[in-house]
A protein has these predicted regions:
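Soluble catalytic domains of membrane acyltransferases
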Residues: 62-183
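Membrane-anchoring hydrophobic helices of lipid-metabolizing enzymes
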Residues: 1-82, 92-94, 101-103, 121-122
Length: 183
């Protein structure tokens, strides 16, 4: 099973309109999406937070958590965790792992494509980072995020909506402008 196919990638980033055969395949390789599909297939039998642990172990990521810092996470009530997103999905997995260790009901606003990971679907509120906040593909996610907070459930947000990129004009890696909804 694949998390994302060439066709889905092409549609999501509007490559399908360019009529350039092979470009989606090339991007799947360059963006390591084929590797992600392989790692998922190897761990698809694991559910929930143990799935995150298996993925992190599979890709060789270790995390050290200061137990004293975990005490800063409110034990009840809604809050919003805001994080940068420099590398991609890894930040989402780590944020889920850390916050859910204290608040198992935590939800994360995430790219709608991540909803294809059935092992973690319960944790995601899908939005489309390739569209504006007012786009039909994001309105449902925004409503669900507001309901989540009203219900006292904590929510994680990556306000840039996409991974950081290298800006040649600034000679550094930067986030895209944050969504005005967050900051």
């Amino acid at each position: 099973m694949e998390i994302i196919t060439e066709k889905e990638l092409a549609t999501a980033i509007k490559l399908d309109k360019l009529k350039m055969p092979g470009l989606a395949s090339f991007l799947m390789e360059v963006m390591k999406l084929n590797e992600i599909n392989h790692v998922f297939a190897s761990n698809m039998h694991i559910e929930g937070l143990p799935f995150i642990d298996a993925i992190l172990e599979h890709i060789g990521v270790k995390i050290e958590i200061d137990e004293a810092e975990l005490k800063n996470i409110p034990k009840d009530g809604a809050f919003i965790a805001v994080a940068n997103h420099p590398f991609g999905g890894i930040e989402g997995l780590l944020l889920l792992k850390v916050i859910c260790s204290q608040r198992s009901e935590f939800k994360l606003m995430a790219n709608f494509l991540l909803n294809k990971i059935p092992n973690l679907k319960e944790y995601f509120i899908p939005v489309n980072p390739f569209e504006t906040v007012r786009s039909v593909s994001s309105i449902g996610g925004m409503k669900l995020a507001m309901e989540t907070l009203r219900d006292g459930i904590p929510l994680g947000i990556f306000p840039a909506g996409e991974v950081s990129t290298f800006k040649t004009s600034e000679q550094r890696i930067t986030d895209k402008q944050w969504s005005p909804v967050v900051g």
